[in-house]
């Protein structure tokens, strides 16, 4: 498969491009500016670029797909040519969905805590030798395989692209979802609080029938949104667990007694409770979870 990335300099985009390259796909890409670390990575991976800038000659009818970055402008010459040729143009989340549509998609959403929770989940799974695919906002944040059953996706609420302003997390159709928090910020992509909350309502309703959502019941907006949803899914609330503090150390109350943790913030303890629900749905039992969590920093 030949895939061209318009906006390869975006973190999500080059992570996805590298993951596809590792699978043996033919990858090319362009952007106005690449940071120095990315230039080094692209040289090491032999990703096809012509330097910085846009090159409409890269767009031809031999391409199987064009992936469009979230920050690419509507008059981009490569995008214009791809549209003229009638090529298949995908946003990042659309293309990621196509790559993972036969897997069990675990989507972690929320305004501020999704990345931390996704990191916890991936740490727990790796500690317990549970191999999964993933797509998160971090260096080397995308891994795709043919054999893994699960994929963990960090679901952002930013627009998918200039030609499709649907929020990214509407595209994934999760089997298993987590919603951590809803915090509206003035001056963002969404016009007002009501519109912002509506995007999360659509996300909850996009969970496949019979799927599940794990949600933070201590966030009033999240709680009301999830509990009022008529989508026929299972709903698992979580909250800050019971814990003790002694000599600067946090001890979590567990069925097997107090367990020392490396984390200490109440927010992280609450995030841990959500991660536990997700990991249990992915085959990690309570004992395995707590053993791994004791090593998370």
Descriptions of predicted regions:
Residues 8, 220-221:
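Active-site core of PLP-dependent enzymes with the aminotransferase class I/II
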């Amino acid at each position: 498969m030949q895939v061209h990335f318009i906006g390869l300099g975006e973190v999500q985009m080059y992570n996805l491009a590298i993951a596809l390259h590792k699978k043996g796909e033919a990858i090319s890409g362009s952007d106005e500016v690449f940071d120095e670390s990315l230039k080094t990575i692209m040289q090491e991976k032999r990703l096809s670029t012509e330097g910085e800038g846009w090159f409409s000659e890269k767009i031809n009818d031999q391409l199987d797909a064009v992936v469009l970055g979230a920050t690419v402008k509507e008059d981009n010459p490569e995008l214009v040519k791809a549209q003229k040729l009638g090529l298949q143009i995908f946003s990042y989340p659309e293309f990621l969905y196509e790559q993972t549509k036969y897997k069990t998609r675990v989507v972690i959403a929320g305004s501020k805590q999704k990345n931390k929770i996704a990191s916890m989940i991936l740490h727990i799974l790796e500690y317990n030798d549970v191999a999964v695919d993933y797509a998160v906002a971090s260096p080397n944040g995308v891994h795709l395989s043919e054999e893994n059953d699960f994929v963990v996706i960090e679901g952002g609420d930013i627009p998918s692209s200039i030609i499709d302003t649907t929020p990214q997390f509407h595209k994934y159709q999760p089997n298993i979802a987590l919603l951590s928090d809803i915090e509206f910020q003035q001056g963002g992509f969404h016009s007002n609080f009501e519109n912002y909350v509506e995007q999360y309502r659509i996300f909850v309703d996009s969970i496949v029938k019979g799927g599940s959502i794990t949600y933070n019941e201590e966030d009033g907006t999240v709680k009301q949104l999830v509990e009022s949803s008529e989508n026929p899914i299972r709903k698992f609330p979580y909250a800050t667990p019971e814990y003790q503090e002694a000599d600067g150390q946090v001890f979590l109350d567990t069925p097997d007694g107090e367990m020392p943790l490396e984390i200490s913030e109440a927010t992280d303890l609450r995030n841990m409770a959500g991660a536990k629900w997700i990991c249990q749905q992915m085959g990690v039992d309570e004992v395995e979870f707590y053993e791994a969590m004791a090593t998370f920093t």
